[in-house]
Amino acid sequence: MNISPQYLWNQVLERLQIRLTRPAFETWIQDATVQEWKDNCLVIQVANSFILNHLQKTYQPIIAQEVASVVGYPVDIQLTTAEGETMAMTGEAQSYQEKSLTQIAPESPKLNQLNPRYTFSRFVVGPTNRMAHAASLAVAESPGREFNPLFLCGGVGLGKTHLMQAIAHYRLELYPNAKVFYVSTEQFTNDLIAAIRQDSMERFREHYRRADFLLIDDIQFIEGKEYTQEELFHTFNTLHEAGKQVVLASDRAPKRIPTLQDRLISRFSMGLIADIQVPDLETRMAILQKKAQYENMRLPRDVVEYIATNYTSNIRELEGALIRAIAYTSISGLSMTVQNIAPVLNPPVEQVPASPEVILRTVAESLKVSIEDLKGSSRRREISFARQVGMYLMRQHTELSLPRIGEEFGGKDHTTVLYSCDKISKLQQKDWELSQMLSELSDRINMASRTQS
């Protein structure tokens, strides 16, 4: 059959898109490109060795099947990366579905603790969570193989619980009878305490050690719980030796959990530790747009950018701000504009400790006045306003008393400082442009302070 490599690969992609789940296709297959097809060998380039290895281990049969179905005969397939790493796809073209089915036991307890919104399709992937997402999908597809245990690590509200529950949803959608246990550390401990009180430890151990998939959230709360650590150690060993998948989530790496037994640190670190960082601006905007889509809302771009710019610490705060904005505009009947939502949201300003000199210099440069003007007694409107802004920001970013702030501004009285701070605080609740300006000034002060430290 005389067809071009690109046409062949496009046909294969169309077929794979139908056969695979959307998260699986978008994570592993979608960005792969065809490099060459000659001498009955199709060369496919992928982004990195992580994807290359997973395709070889998990998707070799289904890719081989679809390539053969397009050209009409078996074809050798070689995977490569831009760095030159290569791997041949070899082995029997066993059915992808048949291969997975052999790993699952026929019965499973009911699982009623999952949030229906926490699925892979609703998880927004960005540079700061891409590895964690890919690893989570990998263990959901092929448990007990590459990353066991998988340890998700990141701050509060960054998506660890979402990914853990997405793993559980994925397995249960494919295999409703799979024994998938998703619990918090608190629940695991409470179950253990109840078993001790009821003299039913054997039942407790049997329950957790028959899992095909054990996902434990907030594992940092195991700190100081010696007996819980003891039971978890033996449960982990039993499951791991049986090839069952364990997934753990924490706000810190295993070695940073106080009083965690060394043997548990070793076990938790033997698989993959996938870190999740604060999402960047583009990812935060994408999260808001997807959230609005599920709420059947169309958000103006400037509103999305305003919320994403001002809520940077975690996803929960970000989505909470959007919900407040939607609720306010719905109840008030106002249109969704930055001017209308800014006073209601009143976004938090990160306060990095800063020196008075940094604050004075930042305000002077940004508002086009001199430091001498800020410390002087001029009552010109633009200078007086800049001075009030400077006093407000100095109160936000330092621990200085009102009299000390007054001294930094040329010996002003503490009542003048208090008046200025109150005035700016009240104005920003009504004036979205002022609120935005204060946020930008705080960001500049933060950046300058971090550079100095």
Curated annotation (Swiss-Prot):
UniProt keyword annotation of Lipoprotein present: no
Domain of life: Bacteria
Major location (coarse): cytoplasm
Binding site for ATP: G157, G159, K160, T161
Residue ranges, annotated region (Domain IV, binds dsDNA): 330-453
GO terms under cellular component: cytoplasm; plasma membrane
Domain II, as annotated region: 73-112
UniProt record, GO biological process: DNA replication initiation; regulation of DNA replication
Location of region: Domain III, AAA+ region: 113-329
Annotated keywords: ATP-binding, Cytoplasm, DNA replication, DNA-binding, Lipid-binding, Nucleotide-binding
GO molecular function terms noted in the UniProt entry: ATP binding; ATP hydrolysis activity; DNA replication origin binding; lipid binding
Gene3D superfamilies, sorted: 1.10.1750.10, 1.10.8.60, 3.30.300.180, P-loop containing nucleotide triphosphate hydrolases (3.40.50.300)
CDD domains: AAA, Bac_DnaA_C
Entry annotated with the keyword Transmembrane helix: no
Localization terms from the record: Cytoplasm
Segments for region (Domain I, interacts with DnaA modulators): 1-73
Job of this protein: Plays an essential role in the initiation and regulation of chromosomal replication. ATP-DnaA binds to the origin of replication (oriC) to initiate formation of the DNA replication initiation complex once per cell cycle. Binds the DnaA box (a 9 base pair repeat at the origin) and separates the double-stranded (ds)DNA. Forms a right-handed helical filament on oriC DNA; dsDNA binds to the exterior of the filament while single-stranded (ss)DNA is stabiized in the filament's interior.
The protein's assembly and partners: Oligomerizes as a right-handed, spiral filament on DNA at oriC.
Domain notes: Domain I is involved in oligomerization and binding regulators, domain II is flexibile and of varying length in different bacteria, domain III forms the AAA+ region, while domain IV binds dsDNA.
Annotated family: Belongs to the DnaA family.
Name of the molecule in the record: Chromosomal replication initiator protein DnaA
Organism: Rippkaea orientalis (strain PCC 8801 / RF-1)
